[in-house]
From Swiss-Prot:
It comes from Nocardia farcinica (strain IFM 10152). The keyword Lyase does not apply. This is dITP/XTP pyrophosphatase. GO terms for biological process: nucleotide metabolic process; purine nucleoside triphosphate catabolic process. It is an enzyme of class 3 (hydrolase). Substrate binds at residues 10-15, 76, 158-161, 181, 186-187.
Length: 206
């Protein structure tokens, strides 16, 4: 069977592994996931959208146009109730340096220092886009509600996972197994919404 190559517009190995696990768990065969390190470099547009959906779609369009491959891209972040939904689309660079998880977590804790437990509600949000060259564009969204803890806990995950306690649980996202996180997380929920479109790509190669 010919494999449908699908580009994920990311160099984050954990994101690539997450989508591969979700495809495997859903029994979707015939899709080969590749990341940005597996294709020739191209100019990546900055994330300037006002919403997660705008950023995800822009990244997916860029990847599909540059490589000729169907491209999946996501934009995700943390929306904290007490901060009026921030850091939102600025989540990865909340402290001023893109991708500095420790600094971002430290700043968030400082901003919520005097916020009582009952007002520490938050949700992870993920928008995922799939763009097929010369074909369809699909944009989906997943949300994961919870609260922000008082200190980082757990070694797994990335981003704000060590601070985020999902609703109905007593451990942080960073303390969950990969399988448990896939089943519940915002990105897992969004990616599962893309499964029919990804399965259709696999069907086209049979």
């Amino acid at each position: 069977m010919t494999m449908a190559r699908v580009l994920v517009a990311s160099r984050n190995a954990k994101k690539l592994a997450e989508l591969r696990r979700i495809l495997d768990d859903a029994g979707v065969a015939g899709v080969q996931i590749v990341g940005l390190d597996d294709v020739p470099p191209y100019d990546e547009a900055p994330e300037t959208g006002a919403t997660f959906e705008e950023n995800a779609l822009a990244k997916a369009r860029d990847g599909a146009a540059a490589t000729g491959l169907p491209c999946v891209a996501d934009d995700s972040g943390l929306a904290v109730d007490a901060l009026n939904g921030m850091p939102g689309v600025l989540s990865a660079r909340w402290s001023g340096t893109h991708g500095d998880d420790a600094a971002n977590n430290a700043l968030l804790l400082a901003q919520l220092r005097d916020v009582p437990d009952e007002r520490r509600g938050a949700r992870f949000v993920s928008a995922c886009a799939l763009v097929v060259p010369g074909g369809t564009e699909t944009v989906v969204r997943g949300e994961w509600p919870g609260t922000i803890g008082r200190k980082p806990m757990g070694e797994g995950g990335f981003g704000y996972d060590p601070l985020f306690v999902p609703d109905g649980g007593d451990v942080t996202a960073a303390q969950l197994t990969p399988a448990a996180k896939d089943a519940a997380s915002h990105r897992g929920r969004a990616l599962r919404h893309l499964l029919p479109a990804l399965a259709a790509l696999a069907d086209r190669t049979e």
